């Protein structure tokens, strides 16, 4: 390990009380990001080809085959379509809509889990950076008063503290905001696809033909 880099990191952490807090927030953000990426990769897939196969079996009246295709699919949408197809045996539109609504809410809850953390971090990180700025300015004026002399060297440490803390807070906030918007876009895409697929299946079952 290069001691220069280690010293630089330690010095940055010592610049302000805000820096360790921002570091912890960054570590938590990255950990949740990795967990959510893995979950979305496994459970948030949208497969139009799977839906087309299910749809073709429904048009032919082969509900068991359609259920089997849905059961082989992976992800929350496949689970929801399988449940809707199970309810389709009764050909009761209200029952199918009820099942679709339940799975819509379930999908929204599972995909939306922990996303609020990114929104919270994007909001409070700049405030922590601002706190670091205030503390840095206070340190600069304190050093100036204790020195009894003026000059840029006296206040340099306090100003650097303010700038580093502010930059770190903005960096964490921007990163969290981008992550939140990305997952929010994915969430809306999955929910819209689920609603369209489910409603189309229910309509085909109800009227007995393709739409």
Predicted regions and their residues:
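Predominantly long cytosolic amphipathic alpha-helical stalk/bundle segments
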Residues: 44-131, 135-149, 181-211
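Alpha-helical membrane-interface segments at transmembrane helix boundaries
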Residues: 6-18, 101-122, 152-164
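Hydrophobic alpha-helical transmembrane segments of polytopic membrane proteins
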Residues: 160-178
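Alpha-helical transmembrane segments of integral membrane proteins
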Residues: 19-32, 119-126, 172-176
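Hydrophobic membrane-targeting segments
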Residues: 1-51
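Residue-level signature of catalytic and energy-coupling elements of molecular machines
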Residues: 16, 30, 66, 81, ...
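Acidic-residue sensor for enzyme active/binding pockets
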Residues: 35, 161, 200
């Amino acid at each position: 390990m290069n001691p220069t880099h280690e010293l630089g990191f330690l010095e940055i952490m010592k610049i302000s009380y805000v820096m360790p807090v921002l570091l912890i927030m960054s570590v938590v953000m990255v950990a949740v990001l990795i967990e959510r990426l893995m979950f979305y990769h496994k459970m948030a897939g949208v497969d139009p080809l799977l839906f087309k196969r299910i749809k073709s079996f429904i048009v032919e009246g082969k509900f068991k085959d359609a259920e089997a295709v849905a059961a082989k699919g992976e992800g929350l949408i496949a689970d929801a379509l399988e449940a809707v197809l199970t309810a389709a045996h009764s050909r009761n539109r209200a029952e199918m809509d009820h099942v679709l609504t339940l799975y819509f809410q379930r999908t929204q809850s599972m995909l939306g889990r922990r996303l609020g953390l990114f929104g919270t971090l994007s909001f409070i990180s700049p405030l922590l950076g601002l706190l670091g700025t205030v503390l840095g300015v206070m340190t600069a004026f304190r050093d100036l008063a204790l020195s009894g002399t003026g000059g840029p060297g006296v206040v340099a440490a306090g100003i650097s503290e303010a700038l580093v803390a502010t930059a770190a807070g903005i960096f964490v906030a921007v990163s969290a905001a981008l992550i939140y918007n990305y997952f929010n876009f994915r969430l809306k895409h999955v929910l819209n696809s689920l609603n369209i697929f489910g409603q189309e299946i229910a309509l085909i079952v109800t009227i007995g033909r393709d739409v």
